[in-house]
UniProtKB/Swiss-Prot annotation:
Main function: The enzymes which catalyze the reversible phosphorolysis of pyrimidine nucleosides are involved in the degradation of these compounds and in their utilization as carbon and energy sources, or in the rescue of pyrimidine bases for nucleotide synthesis.
Family under the similarity heading: Belongs to the thymidine/pyrimidine-nucleoside phosphorylase family.
Keywords: Glycosyltransferase, Transferase
Descriptive protein name: Thymidine phosphorylase
Length: 440
């Protein structure tokens, strides 16, 4: 039997906690036998004293085990259970293509996703712009879709890692969110509850990233790879660029439109293609569906070219109560904004810098994201035809096309876009889309 205050004292004094102590504390968070003050105190001691790798693994596993852990054995699936998690960005619509592409190559992707957070868009919000799309199928239906289609993207239910929800709420109001061991456990508790064989992490770097510096993004990626492999799940991470909007669009319906166009081959933004392919390659190799980069890329290109990936996306939408002909007729189903008009730079020049975070916040301000959990979303608003770093802009080539609910909203968004995009006399050096791959 342990005492919560003794566990806090031990960590306060800079000592490592045992697996049993960590499990006792996390179970107490779940059962409400540990107070909010005690959660706050432990979070702050971890913030200042960090955790050893064994402590980080124990914390993650205890949080995972605080709720249901999915088990796929009874379905006798003939492929690996794999998933991807992104730290979030703007125009980061990779999940919508990646899930179907990997499923078309023989993987099974039970993706439990999130809503928008701060300036970053949420995969669930994007999918809810599809009429009828059900992000909360019951457990049996979720399993059926995984077995039949190969991929489902759903919201987090209360039975998955419940201790994380309470722990996170306390961290949020006590300035202890940005602690690498706590972020790692929070992300992985939910992902590892999916019962995965392999995981790839997309850790963003740059002006639209969750972590403020390259070094911190790298430290988070290394921590996640270390802990997840320590917990028995083959995991790699890619550090990818978020110094500009990843897709050509940012919003909800506009990003779903771009995802469908990507899958059908109608339009593929080169940077979005690079990042999506790189993540899919990791999933295929870690999931043992391909032996190397070349084989993985060939398989992925084939399912894009032969229409299989687009077909899987359509089947997922239909299985989750969306329209059965969505891929063919997406334009008919997706909501459109009242006012669609381009915004131009005041001078001509080359796009040299982008405050990606500010562009994400501009989408939120237009109604495309939430400032608080109770807000409703306008799925139709956002940006399309975004200029990219190095593009020449003038009176002919706009900075973006703004999809707004009215003229006032358009004016505010136009101001935000102009302020967020800097121009120079010459094009900047091009930056890579993938900076580094991190494996165990």
């Amino acid at each position: 039997m342990f005492l919560a205050q003794e566990i806090i004292r031990k960590k306060r004094d800079g000592h490592a906690l045992s697996d049993e102590e960590i499990r006792f504390f996390i179970n107490g968070i779940r059962d409400n036998t540990i107070s909010e003050g005690q959660i706050a105190a432990l979070a702050m001691t971890i913030f200042f004293h960090d955790m050893t790798m064994p402590e980080r693994v124990s914390l993650t596993m205890a949080m995972r085990d605080s709720g249901t852990v999915l088990d796929w054995k009874s379905l006798h699936l003939n492929g690996p259970i794999v998933d991807k998690h992104s730290t979030g960005g703007v125009g980061d619509v990779t999940s919508l293509m990646l899930g179907p592409m990997v499923a078309a190559c023989g993987g099974y992707i039970p993706m439990i996703s999130g809503r928008g957070l701060g300036h970053t868009g949420g995969t669930l919000d994007k999918l809810e712009s599809i009429p009828g799309f059900d992000i909360f199928p019951d457990d049996n239906r979720f399993r059926e879709i995984i077995k039949d289609v190969g991929v489902a993207i759903i919201g987090q239910t209360s039975s998955l890692a419940p201790a994380d929800k309470r722990f996170y709420a306390t961290r949020d109001i006590t300035a202890t969110v940005d602690s690498i061991p706590l972020i790692t456990a929070s992300i992985l508790a939910k992902k590892l509850a999916e019962g995965l064989d392999a995981l790839v992490m997309d850790v963003k770097v740059g002006s639209g990233a969750f972590m403020p510096t390259y070094e911190l993004s790298e430290a988070l990626a290394e921590a996640i790879v270390g802990v997840a492999n320590g917990a028995g799940v083959r995991t790699t991470a890619l550090l990818t660029d978020m110094n500009q909007v990843l897709a050509s669009s940012a919003g909800n319906a506009v990003e779903v439109r771009e995802a469908v166009q990507f899958l059908t081959g109608e339009y593929r933004n080169p940077r979005l293609f690079d990042v999506t392919m790189a993540l899919c390659v990791e999933m295929l190799i870690s999931g043992k569906l391909a032996k190397d980069d070349a084989e993985a890329r060939a398989k992925l290109q084939a399912v894009l070219d032969n229409g299989k990936a687009a077909e899987v996306f359509g089947r997922m939408v239909a299985a989750q109560k969306g329209p059965t002909d969505f891929v063919e007729n997406y334009a008919k189903y997706l909501p459109t904004a009242m006012l669609t008009k381009a915004v131009y730079a005041d001078t001509e020049g080359f796009v040299s810098e982008m405050d990606t975070r500010a562009l994400g916040m501009a989408v939120v301000a237009m109604g495309g994201g939430r400032r608080q959990a109770s807000d409703t979303i306008d799925y139709s608003v956002g940006f399309t035809d975004m200029a990219r770093l190095g593009d020449q802009v003038d009176g002919q080539r706009p900075l973006a096309v703004i999809h707004a609910k009215d003229e006032n909203s358009w004016q505010d968004a136009a101001k935000a876009v102009k302020a967020a995009i800097k121009l120079a006399d010459k094009a900047p050096e091009s930056t890579p889309t993938v900076y580094r791959r991190i494996s165990e």
